[in-house]
Every structure is written in structure tokens, then in C-alpha cells.
């Protein structure tokens, strides 16, 4: 159960997706600009959420922003024949959220991170991209499970 202004984890992921997606068009150069992007998001202001970055959505946004190079490296390992700059912005943002959760959130099982990315792809992405997203995330999850990829907590 969530209280007014405190989104569920799925809603927090959706909020993080929207802000991170927007940052793809106008990147933040500092944490201050990242906080401003959060506070000015219509999904924060229009839904009565605190403009102060907090909670799970903010953790995802700040963590992905901070660790983007590492996250993109992992995505690159498993996106056979696809360079990061060739992956669609929606798909890349969804992949970044899920890979971040797999690597940096021990409380989120990889299967949950994959399922949540696929659910968000139904809301924001193209149906044809789900197999692509699932393939990359499944390969990353198997590498984590097999010890070839290490959590970075």
C-alpha cells in the first residue's frame, strides 16, 4: 500500500523511466540539474508528489545517471551486434533501469527486474522490442547467476 505522494515501485519505475528518457534529449551535467529535472517533471508536480527527490524513483534516477557508463558496458556485452548508440531511446532507458536493478539492488531479483522492464515496455515501448529487451536482460541475468557478471553493491 502506498500513501498519497509515495508511488508504488512500478509507478516509481515509470516515473524514473520518464525522467531518464527526457534526459536523453537534454542531459543533466550535475546532480543539481538532475534534481531540477525531477522537480519539473509533470509526473511529480501534477500528481502531488514532493518536488524533493526521494524514494525509489530518485534512487533509480540518480543511480542510473551516476553508473550509466558501467550499465551501458553491461548492455553492450549482451546486445549482440547492437552498439549502444543504435538502440532505441525507449528500449535503452528500459534496459538501463533493469540492469541497474540487477547490478545495484540486491533486494530486486533479476527475474523481477526483467518482468518490470517488460511491463514498462508495454506502456512505453513497441511490442516488437520486447523480445530484444528480454533477450539482453535474460543473458545478463544468466551471467549474474553463473558468476560471469558480479553485482556491484
Swiss-Prot record:
Biological processes per GO annotation: DNA-templated transcription termination; transcription antitermination
Keywords assigned by UniProt, alphabetized: RNA-binding, Transcription, Transcription antitermination, Transcription regulation
Annotated InterPro entries: NusB-like_sf, NusB_fam, NusB_RsmB_TIM44
GO terms of molecular function: RNA binding
Domain of life: Bacteria
Gene Ontology CC terms: cytosol
Function: Involved in transcription antitermination. Required for transcription of ribosomal RNA (rRNA) genes. Binds specifically to the boxA antiterminator sequence of the ribosomal RNA (rrn) operons.
Stored HAMAP family: NusB (MF_00073)
Family statement drawn from the similarity comment of this UniProt entry: Belongs to the NusB family.
Name of the protein: Transcription antitermination protein NusB
